[in-house]
Curated annotation (Swiss-Prot):
Swiss-Prot/TrEMBL catalytic activity: L-seryl-[protein] + UDP-N-acetyl-alpha-D-glucosamine = 3-O-(N-acetyl-beta-D-glucosaminyl)-L-seryl-[protein] + UDP + H(+); L-threonyl-[protein] + UDP-N-acetyl-alpha-D-glucosamine = 3-O-(N-acetyl-beta-D-glucosaminyl)-L-threonyl-[protein] + UDP + H(+)
Protein name: Probable UDP-N-acetylglucosamine--peptide N-acetylglucosaminyltransferase SPINDLY
GO biological process: gibberellic acid mediated signaling pathway; protein glycosylation
Cell location: Nucleus
Amino acid sequence: MESLQGKESNGAVPVCNGGGGAAAPPAKQQLPEGTDALRYANILRSRNKFADALQLYTTVLDKDGANVEALIGKGICLQAQSLPRQALDCFTEAVKVDPKNACALTHCGMIYKDEGHLVEAAEAYQKARSADPSYKAASEFLAIVLTDLGTSLKLAGNTEDGIQKYCEALEVDSHYAPAYYNLGVVYSEMMQFDVALTCYEKAALERPLYAEAYCNMGVIYKNRGELDAAIACYDRCLTISPNFEIAKNNMAIALTDLGTKVKIEGDINQGVAYYKKALFYNWHYADAMYNLGVAYGEMLNFEMAIVFYELALHFNPRCAEACNNLGVIYKDRDNLDKAVECYQMALSIKPNFSQSLNNLGVVYTVQGKMDAAASMIEKAILANPTYAEAYNNLGVLYRDAGSITLSVQAYERCLQIDPDSRNAGQNRLLAMNYIDEGSDDKLYDAHREWGKRFMKLYAQYTSWDNPKVADRPLVIGYVSPDFFTHSVSYFVEAPLTHHDYTKCKVVVYSGVVKADAKTLRFKDKVLKKGGVWRDIYGIDEKKVATLVREDKVDILVELTGHTANNKLGTMACRPAPIQVTWIGYPNTTGLPAIDYRITDSLADSPNTNQKHVEELVRLPESFLCYTPSPEAGPVCPTPAISNGFITFGSFNNLAKITPKVMQVWARILCAVPNSRLVVKCKPFCCDSIRQKFLSTLEELGLESLRVDLLPLIHLNHDHMQAYSLMDISLDTFPYAGTTTTCESLYMGVPCVTMAGSVHAHNVGVSLLTKVGLGRLVAKTEDEYVSLALDLASDVSALEELRKSLRELMIKSPVCDGESFTRGLESAYRSMWHRYCDGDSPALRRLEVLADQTGEDLNKTAVKLADLKAQRVNATAEEDNQSPVTKFDATSKGGEQPQPQIMVNGVTSPEGNQAVKAQPQIMVNGVSSPHSPSGRCEANGHSSR
């Protein structure tokens, strides 16, 4: 690095008089005299024999004290022996004798400069130049000292004066590279980067091996986002100076940024390569390790992600983002205790880290710790009032606690902040089902508007290569994240098992986050029958659409609707000529790209007033076919026989138990002396939720001592055996149970339900009627109460029904997988025939929509804003219409790493994805000759 002193003289300045000829020294050992003595002294000095030369100069001066050449020579020798004051006396005396002696004046300037007297040094050099304009040494040293003066003034805060001195230096010596360099430093600090870059380029032009200039040029290019140019500059710098630590660190930063850039552009493998190359230049660079963790998380290589997050923490123990993202991984692995530990560690580093506050709240929500969850999410909002996903998760919390109105309000607040929030948009639609009685079209309109907005984010296919042969074997695709022990799995098992694989090639697109034994059983079954199983978890929805087209799927059936981890983005692309929605959601998806919605004539009567974007296709029997769990265990006797009292119960989630439902239940319990109520759902592990529920029933006249509240039971066998606690199951409304109703009936417990005007209200109607218990379907609240009281009045009849109910159910259409699948295949074939005849409901719908909006949806650019790597809260609840819960995982790369909350990393679940956090970003410092700065820390950036 260039020093302020510039070049050292060390006798290099030529002597003015006489000279240093090349004559050999006298043969005799006696000291020469006169002119010979002076010539010999100059020779000795040129050979760095300063002591011997000094003796001769002194001899000469003893005889001729005004000999300027001897005075200068003696001064140089004294200067070389670190005797600057004595040397200055010699040079000063020489100037007295010869005021125009440029050499003596220059040496005076050198001593003044060495002593820090820059002004005096400059004056001496200027006098030397005036005395002899051709004397190059004076100009060179004047340029150096003017540059040093400029730096001193700049450091003292006098920037303009400093610039003036640098410019004066260049007027003196237009080739003096450090002056250009220091001007570059000043203009960089003044944010005038174009001027600074020009100065650095001139410095490098004058001095091609000027490593610092290339380093700082790299800083400017990097800060402009011109990473390739920055890396080229750092590479040139390190070629010149391989051990230049600042440049090596800056190279690591630029490579990390480049890795993040190419990763975001879709080349994650190249991104990983750049991150690893960054570690070659700085093996302890925590940001590169952190971003490797994010990348491996996005590649679903969570073991490697954990390794690099741990390494990032080792080299930067203050990296709260690494702690946060580790928490996301552990949460997704169901290691909730470890996840909580990681989030708490992140918060110990950054107490107001909104992503970790949010994520901790989400875990507490999953655990049913509603009070703790609310506290964390509210703190996240307090830390960042515009943190949209925190409001989304607050909505999930309210939903789980049964406060649907507050839930919808929270989702709408999220959408006010971020109108493109997919999670909040879909969660809002789901929540509205819990309180919709079908009295108006508000919910339909909400779905339709969401669908129109969502479709604009995707380009739609409008032609397919699938041969239009009416009766050829069909390729049926099923797409869902719920091919594990989840409510949907009990209803999709029948077609996976009973499809005629010679007539229907089945392709399963499994988005399961964490596979279990049921997942493996399904996969084995499909593959053995000749089907195809594709694991699509973590794959972009547009890429999934490409897979569907490559598989030439004729009919694509989505099983999720607006619940967690759905692939409606794939459906919006319309990769299959026929698209269907079934079983995962109790309402229209709102997507114009979906042709049909499968139902039956009881869940959606032919004269229904409920509107759907899709065309309804009614199966001949029930639209549901239940495959019981082999872990269910035997039916237990009616508990009233041994208890001496009737126990009513419900295992539906709390969101379905509306105030009106509680009023009706209280009427029933109050009318049956000594009867009890047992309710099981996740939030009841929270004391405040329990107390609120009991207090509401108390206000309705039901003593809390008659109510048993159970939290979520995780083991399926234990959950099913819990039905042995109840004699009669009470369904919810207007959102009826589905899986809970089937479980209740299978365990011998009759269920009372109520018909309504919307699909969600009538699922129980369909199930009970097809099982042969249509008599337990009420049309009004009074009839609902009456039916429950009638059942409770005859314990013997209850016992008889309990003994026969499982067999009755197994023999009914609700459990007849073979017949159900034949009916489903017939419906698929009818859809296909219509398509072959040119009838496509979705295409007609899209044409109308395009005409209405004046847009060509088929040419819409596919870009979903902030769709970061999502990790959503898909919990296996009883009926498990899971809302989308977003975790924030953070991702950073160089200047503005965008995690993925999740969507893109882990930051979010948006696991990596995402909302993404504010990690520490290493910012390039500017190295100057005075005080080269390495790296400094500043807040960067959204993951994911």
